[in-house]
A protein has these predicted regions:
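Structured helix-beta-strand junction loops
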Residues: 50-51, 68, 124-125, 154-155, ...
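Helix-to-loop junction immediately C-terminal to a conserved catalytic motif
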Residues: 45-77
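Catalytic core of membrane glycerolipid acyltransferases/transacylases, capturing the structured
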Residues: 65-137
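Residue-level signal for beta-strand positions within conserved beta-sheet cores that form or flank
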Residues: 52, 96-98, 218-220
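A generic local structural motif
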Residues: 41-42, 56-61, 89-90, 115, ...
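Non-catalytic C-terminal accessory region of glycerolipid acyltransferases
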Residues: 2-16, 20-24, 28, 138-278
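Short, flexible active-site-adjacent loop segments at beta-strand->alpha-helix junctions, enriched
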Residues: 60, 77, 106-108, 165-167, ...
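A transmembrane-helix-recognition feature enriched in membrane-embedded lipid enzymes
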Residues: 2-57, 85, 92, 113-125
Length: 278
């Protein structure tokens, strides 16, 4: 019943897209979608875009995470490829390889047939669930958040999330946008292992990145932090709690950004990391 109530505010195309993507995540389509994501498309994107120019730091900080622990991966957001590459790095970890879900704004991917096709084929259905900008679809956003909470309470699941809530297009990639409370709510209510990360060096243009990978420049640097210790909250959590934790996650990501900045200056000439905002 709640499913139908939440979907009622969506257009016919959005309802179809949601059901297709849910099938790839919760129906019998989940297994082939997982094989496609982990075995084909994510490694292919990583190999095409960054394999020859990627530097990874801090991955050893994750060695103590239990094999089946649910993981919330929180990162900065400069390009469409951020979570793709970070997810690719994690699935290569001997104990952390699992399907990753990347919640996405509904624009294009849930509103057009081409967007749905690209989402299904190019991500293996991992861009699920969707979030909507319009106020009349607020119930759907609550429903999507509850789907993520359920995933993050399930052993072996991983969700990638941007506390900033939207892509940071400013000229300074090291100054994050204000954190939105959604990431804090997921962390507090589900209590997963929260892994912060920072990545920089890419644009939003696929072929530009393919060519850059062949040239091995500019460098793409990814830094992982140790799991975040979450505060204990007695009773029901409130919006103020969610925002406070989201701010904490942003602080952890920003600290990794400072680490990335120092590493970048040590391994390469001064570059223009702000290029990723374009």
């Amino acid at each position: 019943m709640r499913d139908e109530q939440a979907l009622a505010a969506l257009s016919w195309m959005e309802r179809i897209a949601f059901r297709v993507m849910r099938f790839l995540n919760e129906g019998w389509g989940r297994r082939p979608a997982r094989i496609w994501q982990l075995g084909v498309i994510t490694p292919l994107v990583g190999w095409l875009l960054v394999y020859r120019r990627l530097r990874v730091y801090g991955i050893e900080r994750l060695d103590g995470i239990p094999r089946d622990a649910p993981i919330l991966l929180v990162t900065n957001h400069r390009t469409f490829f951020d979570l793709f590459i970070l997810g690719w790095l994690l699935i290569r970890h001997p104990r952390l390889s699992r399907r990753v879900n990347f919640p996405v704004r509904s624009n294009f991917f849930y509103e057009t047939p081409l967007g749905l096709l690209m989402s299904a084929l190019l991500t293996g259905g991992s861009m699920f669930p969707p979030f909507f900008r319009s106020a009349e679809k607020k119930a759907m956003n609550r429903y999507s958040l509850d789907i993520l909470l359920e995933k993050l309470r399930t052993p072996g699941e991983m969700v990638g999330f941007h506390p900033e809530g939207t892509r940071n297009k400013t000229g300074d990639p090291y100054t994050l946008l204000p954190a939105q409370p959604g990431a804090g709510e997921l962390a507090l209510k589900a209590r997963p292992v929260v892994v912060p990360a920072f990545i920089l060096g890419m644009t939003n243009h696929f072929w530009t990145e393919v060519k850059a990978n062949q040239r091995r420049t500019p460098l793409v640097i990814a830094v992982f932090g140790k799991p975040v210790e979450l505060p204990e909250v007695r009773g029901e959590t409130r919006l103020s709690h969610h925002k406070k934790v989201a701010d904490l996650l942003n602080e952890k990501i920003a600290a990794l950004g400072a680490e990335e900045r120092a590493l970048r200056s040590a391994v390469s000439p001064p570059a223009s990391p702000a290029r990723a905002a374009r």
